């Protein structure tokens, strides 16, 4: 069984000092370390160092980033490279989030280069894909997911493809309080795994963790993880409060430990 992955995407929230306090409190509230789940927090760039220090050398929580640039160095004002992130202790990086695509015009070819750069420097890329409400309503969800996967992953080396985690985030469910139904999420995850098998191989597709992201809360995490097609969650708003994120982690650990 694939290990559940829970990723807390803080977005543009928490100063460095606030982040350190938050992480110390979170560590105290988490369930005992488990082989059934893996936890990642992705603070803003400015808080990565303080979070790394607060986590300590043997923390069960891993450090992630919210973006990177595809070149190692250069005249790219405001950007951060993969070597900079690995030097700070990051293990994961979120790429292609819908907010990056919509607000900043991030294109698929850029995301493709970022995935390659991340893997080349030992980071595990989390590729975000998902449809808008209009695309779901007109019945093109599968087409959109297929195209985003092909644009992001086609042509990458086998070892890079094997390192990728995919996060399905229906755009209409992000920050809206609306969540896809379990049936909707499972159908999308099955499409993603089928396309991954075609792009990479059936074995890579079977081993790839596919997360759900879109108004994940302590109240719906159990029902989401009841399906073996859903391998974890990319958590937004609910990860900004210690109690809610710790509860999500606890429920996830119990759910998968008892094989629900």
Task: Tell me the role of every PLM-derived stretch.
Residues 1-260:
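Active-site loop-to-helix "anion-binding N-cap" substructures in soluble metabolic enzymes
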């Amino acid at each position: 069984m694939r290990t559940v992955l829970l990723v807390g995407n803080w977005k543009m929230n928490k100063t460095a000092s606030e982040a350190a306090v938050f992480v110390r409190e979170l560590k105290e509230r988490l369930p005992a370390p488990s082989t059934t789940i893996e936890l990642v927090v992705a603070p803003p760039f400015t808080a990565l160092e303080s979070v790394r220090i607060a986590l300590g050398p043997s923390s069960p929580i891993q450090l992630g980033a919210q973006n990177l640039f595809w070149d190692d160095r250069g005249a790219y004002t405001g950007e951060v490279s993969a070597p900079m992130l690995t030097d700070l202790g990051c293990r994961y990086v979120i790429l292609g989030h819908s907010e990056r695509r919509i607000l900043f015009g991030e294109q698929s070819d850029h995301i493709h280069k970022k995935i390659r750069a991340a893997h080349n420097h030992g980071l595990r890329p989390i590729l975000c894909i998902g449809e808008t409400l209009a695309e779901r309503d007109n019945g093109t969800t599968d087409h959109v997911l297929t195209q985003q996967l092909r644009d992001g992953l086609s042509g990458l080396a086998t070892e890079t493809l094997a390192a990728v985690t995919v996060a399905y985030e229906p755009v209409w469910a992000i920050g809206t309080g609306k969540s896809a139904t379990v049936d909707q999420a499972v159908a999308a995850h099955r499409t993603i795994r089928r396309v991954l098998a075609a792009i990479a191989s059936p074995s890579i597709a079977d081993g790839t963790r596919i997360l759900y992201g879109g108004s994940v809360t302590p109240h719906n995490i159990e029902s989401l993880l009841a399906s073996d097609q859903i391998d974890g969650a990319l958590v937004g708003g609910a990860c900004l409060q210690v109690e809610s994120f710790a509860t999500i982690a606890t429920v996830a650990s119990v759910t998968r430990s008892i094989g629900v």
